[in-house]
Every structure is written in C-alpha cells, then in structure tokens.
Amino acid sequence: MIELHQVSKSFNVNGKTVEAVKNVSITVEKGEIFGVVGYSGAGKSTLVRCINLLERPDAGQVVIDGKNLSTLSSKELRVARRKIGMIFQGYNLLKTATVYDNIAKPLKLEGVPKNEIETRVNKYLSIVGLEDKRNNYPSQLSGGQKQRVAIARALAHEPEILLSDEATSALDPETTEAILQLLLKINAELGITIFLITHELDVIQRICDRVAVMENGHLVEQGTVLDIFTKAKHATTKRFVGSEASFDIPQDLLEKYVATGKLVSLHFIGDEADEPALALVSRKFDVLPSILAGGIDHLKNGTLGKLLVHLKGDEVEYSKAISYLKESGVVVEEVELL
C-alpha cells in the first residue's frame, strides 16, 4: 500500500543544509495502522508530508499502490492525492464556515455533485459522532470536536490512506483516548490504512500494529509494537520504552535490592499474563521473588503485563529460575542501575 524506498529530504536553513529525512525505507500493508515515533526534530513531520508529496523528496521513491508519485504528472498527482487524507494537530478549519460547510467546501472544489456532497457529509458526521453539530461554527466546538470535524473532512474524500500528523498532541488525555478509539473504528469499519506520527508512545501502544522509531532523520528501529516494547535494541527506542515503563522507585532503594540479589524486568505477553510462572519459581527453585512494582498495558492486539522483581538466591538457582521464566514465555531482562 505505502512503500518508501530510501527517501531523503533536506532544507536550506540560513545558508546551511539541514537533512530532515535520511534514507528512510518503510513498507506499510493495506489496512494496517503504522506509527512513527520520535523526539522533536527527529524528522517525523517531514517524513509524513513526503508520503503525499506536500514535501517532495530529494531522493528515493514514494510508491502508493504500485505508483511512484514522483513520476506522475500534476493532474495524475492530484487524482492520487484524493486517495490520501490528512489530519493535523492544528485542525485547519475555516472559522467563518459551519461544520457542514467545512466538510462540504473541499468536495465542491473537487466537483462532487451536490446530492453526493450531502450524502457524504451526513455519513461522515455520523461516523465521527457530530450529527448535532452540523450548523455550529468552530468557535463553538471543543478541541476534540474540532479534530472530529477535521477527520470527517478528510474522510469525505473517501481516501484509502489517512495520514495523521500529531493529531492528538494538543488534546487532553480523555479526548485523546476518544480520538484514538475513533481512528480504530475508522480502520476497522472502513478498512482505511492509517500512517501516524507522534512523540507519545502511549498513542503507538494503544492503536498501532507496527512502529518505526526515528532520530535525527534516520529510522533507527522498526517492528511490531510488542517487539518494540519487549525487545528494543536501539538506545533511542530503549529511552522511549524505559520512560513509559518507569516505576519511579527511589535509586537508593533499588541499590539496596541489587546488593542482596538480582533485579529483573519481566514482561508477560497476552495469555502469559494470566499464567502463574512467577508464583511457581519459588516452589521449583531455591530463590525468593519479591514484586517491587507492576502494571498492565493494553495494546491494540492484546495485553502486556510488566513487573519489576527482586530475586534472592545463589547464582546457579537464579540462572535456573530465569531459564524457566523464559521457557514459560516471559520476556526477562536484568536491570542494571546507572
């Protein structure tokens, strides 16, 4: 559906060349929700704008449904872009137009027949839950409602792909969750492929199938959300995951536990979260486990339990216990203090 092949993009800033995106390659399957996460300045926004050629890459290829967008004529590109909707952090609504007209006007400019415009606007206002706001103006809406209008406007062109550029970053947590649930609904019911960028790992965790991590214009790691959370390899990815999974235990207390045993981070994936593997460790081996902290993350396709555990016992028994946990499907990582 979306193929990025060695895409690069640079800008001239005060006489200096700034490489915003450097040789990025990503493939997104039809119907997938794919996320790109990174800190500010990583190149995320530039990358997402390369997909519909709002930013034309200096090098590489952007291929949508087998078509290299860079080789299309202006007319062909306009047609191709109709299948790529986009939502932004800043809504970009017309202040003097009603909700209905904000959705309808782009369709009028596209030459869509009047009766078809009416049908589409009503359909997508219903999908985003704003049927009763059709005659309201943007100033009368909350931030979440404005974003819903922006989503309806993007959907009214009936795209196959929806690009999301930090669409939830200006919203409060409750509204963010509502928008994420709406995106999941759109993906499931309409079959639309979603490509989103964010600096919030929680957004990735809640709705994405796969994720790529960017730093300084480079793609440093990509994989399933589960793999990124449990088997992160790159330092930047580990910082993201580490900040998300932090239990905020005082350093002096952790040092006390390390002095008397081993500290391990355990991840229980899916059904393994319900298995008593840790409870059986003390029965099978001469080690004493103490749970210091824990929690459960709800991913798009399952659950991920996480525990910080102190294991007290000799080295041989400790090794046996760790092997048993791994064989039981638990992801185990020894915690090293700074």
UniProtKB/Swiss-Prot annotation:
Keywords: Amino-acid transport, ATP-binding, Cell membrane, Membrane, Nucleotide-binding, Translocase, Transport. ATP binds at G38, Y39, S40, G41, A42, G43, K44, S45. It catalyses: L-methionine(out) + ATP + H2O = L-methionine(in) + ADP + phosphate + H(+); D-methionine(out) + ATP + H2O = D-methionine(in) + ADP + phosphate + H(+). It is a peripheral membrane protein. Its EC number is 7.4.2.11. GO terms for molecular function: ABC-type D-methionine transporter activity; ATP binding; ATP hydrolysis activity. The keyword Manganese does not apply. It comes from the Bacteria. Pfam families: ABC_tran, NIL. It is found in: Cell membrane. Residues 2-241 form the ABC transporter domain. It is an enzyme of class 7 (translocase). CDD domains: ABC_MetN_methionine_transporter. GO terms for cellular component: plasma membrane. Belongs to the ABC transporter superfamily. Methionine importer (TC 3.A.1.24) family. Part of the ABC transporter complex MetNIQ involved in methionine import. Responsible for energy coupling to the transport system. The complex is composed of two ATP-binding proteins (MetN), two transmembrane proteins (MetI) and a solute-binding protein (MetQ). This is Methionine import ATP-binding protein MetN 1. It comes from Listeria monocytogenes serovar 1/2a (strain ATCC BAA-679 / EGD-e). The gene is metN1.
